[in-house]
């Protein structure tokens, strides 16, 4: 364990194809590589930096023999997956300790600059906890579709797959005990569950991801659009009961929101739930051949779990 001004680090052996030597006591080959892990409790983030050791002895050698090669950020809850062989104490000379700390702060500062809006996943939840509302929903039940033009109450709607899309208007929610929607099929063959992070929209592709922000309180959540609606005047989106609770407008029933379509996150999400898009626009208009018969890429993480992970990536709440 390296301690520099209250910052704690773990030393972890990395595999080296050319030289697969392991720790023995406090010695290691000069070609061995290690991982430096920094935990920042104030932000809940964890960083790693690959460092190389020049010399044989870890303990008792001047600290200058350790140098940083590269760094990256990792989800804190992935730390148990790191193969930690042993933990060591490294003596740090006062002058070098200060330099190492400044270098680490500089490296980690650069790492954070480009990702200030997209923070790594939270460490507070396990896959089991994130999947508690649909633990057996490991195979997506619906299919991908954009859909044909349709008419409701004399108004024609034209579903499409935009490159970018934002919309501001009023949101309502559905899935209450008396409205009868819970458990019914959605427009793309999925099964509606009032406890999941889903929504209905008139024209966006199904399924896709949107960020919904409550203009009244700035609370936001990312939802999977898997149904059509709402068709009441001035309503632009219907969200599930759980989403309404997170956005804090369940009691009043409606609120003004901003919708942002997330095409890049949608593409990643479709891959994670093993749902392929139809090859042609014609098939996308009304496709049931795009249904997934494979479990999600992480068989411990349900479909709703994958939606929650994206929320955590953007540091958004997944519970009311």
Swiss-Prot record:
Pfam annotation, one family: DPBB_1
InterPro entries: RlpA, RlpA-like_DPBB, RlpA-like_sf, RPE1, RPE5, RplA
Family matches, as SUPFAM superfamilies: Barwin-like endoglucanases (SSF50685)
Superkingdom of the organism of origin: Bacteria
Annotated disulfide bonds: none
Catalytic activity, EC: 4.2.2.-
Biological processes, Gene Ontology terms: cell wall organization; peptidoglycan metabolic process
Keywords: Cell wall biogenesis/degradation, Lyase
Annotated function: Lytic transglycosylase with a strong preference for naked glycan strands that lack stem peptides.
Name this protein carries in UniProt: Endolytic peptidoglycan transglycosylase RlpA
Organism annotation: Rickettsia conorii (strain ATCC VR-613 / Malish 7)
């Amino acid at each position: 364990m390296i301690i520099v001004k209250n910052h704690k680090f773990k030393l972890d052996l990395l595999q080296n194809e050319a030289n697969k030597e392991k720790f023995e006591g406090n010695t290691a080959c000069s070609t061995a590589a290690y991982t430096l892990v920094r935990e920042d409790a104030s932000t809940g983030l964890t960083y790693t930096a690959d460092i190389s050791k020049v010399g044989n002895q870890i303990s008792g050698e001047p600290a200058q023999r350790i140098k940083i090669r590269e760094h990256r950020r990792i989800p804190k809850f992935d730390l148990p997956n790191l193969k930690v062989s042993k933990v060591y104490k490294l003596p740090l000379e006062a002058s070098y300790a200060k330099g190492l700390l400044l270098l680490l702060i500089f490296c980690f500062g650069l790492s954070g600059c480009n990702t200030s809006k997209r923070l790594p996943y939270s460490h507070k939840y396990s896959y089991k906890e994130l999947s508690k509302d649909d633990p057996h929903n490991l195979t997506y039940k619906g299919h991908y579709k954009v859909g044909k033009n349709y008419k409701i109450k004399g108004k024609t709607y034209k579903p499409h797959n935009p490159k970018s899309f934002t919309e501001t208007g009023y949101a309502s929610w559905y899935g209450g005990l008396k409205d009868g929607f819970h458990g019914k099929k959605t427009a793309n063959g999925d099964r509606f569950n009032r406890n999941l992070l889903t929504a209905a929209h008139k024209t966006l592709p199904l399924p896709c991801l949107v960020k919904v922000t409550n203009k009244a309180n700035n609370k936001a959540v990312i939802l999977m659009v898997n149904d059509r609606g709402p068709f009441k005047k001035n309503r632009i989106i219907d969200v599930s009961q759980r989403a309404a609770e997170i956005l804090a407008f369940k009691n009043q029933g409606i609120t003004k929101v901003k919708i942002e379509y997330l095409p890049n996150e949608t593409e990643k999400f479709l891959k994670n739930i093993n749902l392929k898009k139809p090859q042609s626009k014609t098939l996308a208009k009304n496709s049931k051949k795009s249904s997934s018969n494979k479990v999600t890429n992480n068989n411990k993480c349900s479909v709703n779990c994958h939606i929650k992970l994206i929320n955590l990536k953007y540091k958004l709440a997944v519970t009311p």
